[in-house]
Amino acid sequence: MTQHSRDTPQFYLTAPSPCPYLPGRQERKVFTHLVGDKATDLNDLLTHGGFRRSQSIAYRPACDQCRACVSVRVIANEFRPSRNFRKVLARNSDLVGEQRSAVPTSEQYSIFRSYLDQRHRHGGMADMTVLDYAMMVEDSHVETRIIEYRRRNLSNGPNARGGELVAVALTDVLSDGLSMVYSFFDPSETTRSLGTFMILDHIARARRQGLPYVYLGYWIEGSKKMDYKSRYLPQQRLAAAGWLRVEAEGGPAPEPQE
């Protein structure tokens, strides 16, 4: 193998398979491996182009006759929480987010397993074992963090480590933002809206770190599972002309955003 072939990413196309989001459609993905010294730079570049990371693979939809999957990123510094979002923040004011290295724990897996069993028992991740979970967390050649959300343990003082674990986010740190790779929570906490809370917390974290964006993955028009991503405004959506600004739940602005 030549030096050029080692340094140049190789892209592959998957065979068609049933789309998990839009009934009656087939999906295909183009993917490459994120390995070596240039993995971080490549992940940045590909994320800007609409790719997502899963372990050491970066992928994006490449469906034959469908372009429904649209990459979305929230403009962190301009985001202002709505009344409903402020209520979510208030309901979770007893939680503290602790950023850690991407190291899996049995405590995390217990929450992860309960989350899959209650929320996604028929999904593609339903059969993941503890070893599969460990691979999901550890198999990364880019800057990845775990954020654990725990009940605030006031009995041990204001600076004490949090108490019971209720939610977890696996997050990549990019040059221009935070990319939420996967998040999960205790499904018994039905009144907290923990998925929403973790996104709001990531927006606040990005703002504090001076990072302009929070990448949420794909918004898919017509998929109820993905409708929630359109509520975090202003945001940008990736189109053929580039990243287009969206001010309200509707069409994007006509001019691409840098």
Curated annotation (Swiss-Prot):
Function, as annotated: Functions in the N-end rule pathway of protein degradation where it conjugates Leu from its aminoacyl-tRNA to the N-termini of proteins containing an N-terminal aspartate or glutamate.
Q: Give the main EC class.
A: transferase
Asked whether the keyword Translocase is assigned, the reply is no
Keyword vocabulary terms for this entry:
Acyltransferase, Cytoplasm, Transferase
GO BP term, pick one: ubiquitin-dependent protein catabolic process via the N-end rule pathway
- The main location is cytoplasm
**What does the organism's lineage look like at the top?**
Bacteria, Pseudomonadati, Pseudomonadota, Alphaproteobacteria, Hyphomicrobiales
One Pfam family recorded for the sequence: ATE_C
Q: Which segments does the entry list as coiled coil?
A: none
Query: What is the protein name given in its UniProt record?
Result: Aspartate/glutamate leucyltransferase
- Alphabetized InterPro entries for the sequence: Acyl_CoA_acyltransferase, Asp_Glu_LeuTrfase, N-end_Aminoacyl_Trfase, N-end_Aminoacyl_Trfase_C, N-end_Aminoacyl_Trfase_N
Where is this gene product found?
A: Cytoplasm
Q: What's a Gene Ontology MF term here?
A: arginyl-tRNA--protein transferase activity
Similarity remark: Belongs to the R-transferase family. Bpt subfamily.
**Catalytic reactions on record:** N-terminal L-glutamyl-[protein] + L-leucyl-tRNA(Leu) = N-terminal L-leucyl-L-glutamyl-[protein] + tRNA(Leu) + H(+); N-terminal L-aspartyl-[protein] + L-leucyl-tRNA(Leu) = N-terminal L-leucyl-L-aspartyl-[protein] + tRNA(Leu) + H(+)
